[in-house]
Regions:
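Extracellular, disulfide-bonded carbohydrate-recognition/adhesion ectodomains
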Residues: 1-112
Length: 112
């Protein structure tokens, strides 16, 4: 079961917090999971975007817990394929697609 945490944290702080709770930052593996996340963000988040477990490492995006990246919800245009150095963490908002975002920004986050 997923749980939204509204206390804004950097991506690394959010990951550490989730792992201290014996969970991880959430993976969004389907359109259904995206819709559920959008609803939860609208109802609870204190920031426009929230952190997910999506991270750009090496030359690709991956879920930090090892889930396969079969479902993808990037915006058209492909800017996520080679993100700027500071835009290497995945976030999602109330209705839109995934975003490559600055890992040092403090956002609400979802653990599962």
């Amino acid at each position: 079961m997923e749980k939204m945490f509204i206390q804004p944290k950097t991506w690394e702080e959010a990951l550490e917090f989730c792992r201290e709770q014996h969970t991880d930052l959430t993976s969004l593996l389907s359109e259904t999971e995206m819709l559920l996340a959008h609803r939860e963000i609208q109802e609870q988040a204190q920031t426009a975007l929230v952190w997910t477990g999506l991270r750009f490492l090496g030359d690709r995006w991956l879920w930090v817990n090892g889930d396969p990246l079969d479902y993808q919800a990037w915006p058209p245009g492909g800017g996520h394929q080679c993100p700027a150095r500071n835009l290497r963490c995945g976030a999602v908002g109330t209705a839109g697609p995934w975003e490559a975002h600055d890992c040092q920004e403090k956002l609400s986050f979802i653990c599962y």
